[in-house]
Curated annotation (Swiss-Prot):
Disulfide bonds: none annotated. Its EC number is 6.1.1.22. It comes from Thermosynechococcus vestitus (strain NIES-2133 / IAM M-273 / BP-1). Keywords: Aminoacyl-tRNA synthetase, ATP-binding, Cytoplasm, Ligase, Nucleotide-binding, Protein biosynthesis. Homodimer. This is Asparagine--tRNA ligase. The gene is asnS. One of its GO terms (biological process) is asparaginyl-tRNA aminoacylation.
Length: 462
């Protein structure tokens, strides 16, 4: 296996003879030698390769060694006289794998706007910013699995194609093989999905939660981590049509246990990234948002504040702020309300709990007051809601009534109700939008810049 530049920079010794492969970021030709900055994606920093004129003269492809070209260098590591890194490679042999015409290659040595980079999404991973984003994204995913695996959770794979709408919002992508120009019709004139591939209407999943509840009733503690889909026609910096969700589900757990786990989970992930991606986080601190390190440190170390929804409404009403959206008991909190609570009132992450039943999903447990449900949201400075969760309704009759009162057809949820017929227990869970986490971690303004291939209204390249 070839040596990666990250390992060479951290473990390479003066005098080592190595071969390294990567892509040319920059090339500078001087009187006695040529300097090439080579990057292979393993680290933000590139390896400086020094090519003596004698070696350059013996390399016919030297003129094609331009920004974007893929190349292989063999030589000896020597102490670098420069300040930026301790060692550099003095090349003795050069092999050019692939050229990049400088007249047409769009990534040159200058800053490109993120808007421009979205138009060349197949090349933007080669930039410093997107490279750093992807390494932080990888570290977040690694931390998520480590957190749950260390606590005995079972990773379960919930279906991408589903027959149920977890959120009841109706923002679903339909999956069909019917001829849309001449679909079969029912006697009432509606599309007859009984003749479709699955014999019924099917959708891309909006959440793995309901299926995770099935698994939690057998394995106690489980989690899902996979793609979800929302057909929400929102062209904003916070919305994607395809995104990843982390959704743990715990049997024999109430809302308090759910909140405690969610707080510990976020603290673990932020600490892991700070410890494992210091160079990338320093890059975001310098280039993107001067407060990302302090924010991440706060998330990793400070205990979260707690407010009931009713208390939060009182705080907002007494704030003296002229919010764009109205504040009243029974209305959902908007992003401006969430950010005020986290950034100004609590000045740290805050968990808001016990929301009005009317504004929350049917599966959330009805509290004894009959007006609120055992739901919680974790609100973070600068971004607002980062986690949403609840204790689930384990009582058959109450759940059945909630489905009906929210205007849903009980028929597709027969199996969900069955879980309450046989060995029902209190259980709880939460959901984390993975891209929202990465966006918060890195300070990136637009969520489309923290996922490799963003899916948004009017855009599904590749």
């Amino acid at each position: 296996m070839q040596q990666r530049i990250k390992d060479i920079l951290h473990q390479g010794q003066v005098g080592d003879r190595i071969t390294v492969k990567g892509w040319v970021r920059t090339k500078r030709e001087l009187k006695e030698c040529t300097f090439v900055n080579l990057n292979d994606g393993s680290t933000l920093a590139g390896l400086q390769v020094v090519i003596p004129n004698t070696v350059a003269a013996a390399t016919p492809t030297m003129k094609d060694l331009t920004t974007g070209a893929a190349a292989e260098f063999t030589g000896e590591l020597v102490r670098s006289p420069g300040k930026n890194q301790a060692i550099e490679l003095h090349a003795e042999e050069i092999h050019l794998w692939g050229t990049a015409d400088p007249e047409t290659y769009p990534l040159q040595k200058k800053r490109h706007s993120f808007e421009f980079l979205r138009t060349i999404a197949h090349l933007r991973p080669r930039t410093n910013t997107l490279g750093a984003v992807m390494r932080v994204r990888n570290a977040c995913a690694t931390a998520i699995h480590q957190f749950f695996q260390e606590r005995g959770f079972l990773w379960v794979h919930t279906p991408i194609i589903t027959a149920s709408d977890c959120e009841g919002a109706g923002e679903l992508f339909t999956v069909t093989t019917l001829d849309l120009t001449q679909p079969p019709k029912t006697p009432e004139g509606k599309i007859d999905f009984s003749q479709d591939f699955f014999g019924r209407r099917a959708y891309l999943t909006v959440s793995g939660q309901l299926e995770a509840e099935i698994m939690a009733t057998a394995f106690t503690n489980v989690y899902t981590f996979g793609p979800t889909f929302r057909a929400e026609n929102s062209n904003t910096s916070r919305h994607l049509a395809e995104f990843w969700m982390v959704e743990p589900e715990m049997a024999f757990c109430d809302l308090r246990g759910d909140m405690e786990l969610a707080e510990a989970f976020l603290q673990f992930v932020f600490r892991y990234v700070l410890d494992h991606c210091p160079e990338d986080m320093a890059f975001f601190q310098e280039r993107i948002d001067h407060s990302v390190m302090a924010t991440a440190e706060q998330m990793a170390t400070q205990p979260f504040a707690h407010l009931s929804y009713s208390e939060a409404i009182q705080v907002l009403e007494k704030s003296g702020r002229a919010f764009e959206f109205p504040v009243a008991w029974g209305l959902d909190l908007q992003s401006e309300h969430e950010r005020y609570l986290a950034e100004e009132y609590c000045q740290r992450p805050v968990i808001v709990y016990d929301y009005p039943a009317a504004i929350k999903a049917f599966y959330m447990r009805l509290n004894d007051d009959g007006k609120t449900v055992a739901a919680m949201d974790i609100l973070a400075p600068k971004i607002g809601e980062i986690i949403g969760g609840s204790q689930r309704e384990e009582r058959f009759d109450v759940l059945q009534e909630r489905i009906v009162t929210q205007g849903l057809d009980p028929a597709p949820y027969w199996w969900y109700l069955d879980l309450r017929r046989y060995g029902s227990v209190p259980h709880a869970g939460f959901g984390l939008g993975f891209e929202r986490l990465v966006q918060f971690m890195t300070g990136m303004d637009n969520i489309r810049d923290v996922i490799p291939f963003p899916r948004t209204p009017g855009n599904a390249e590749f």
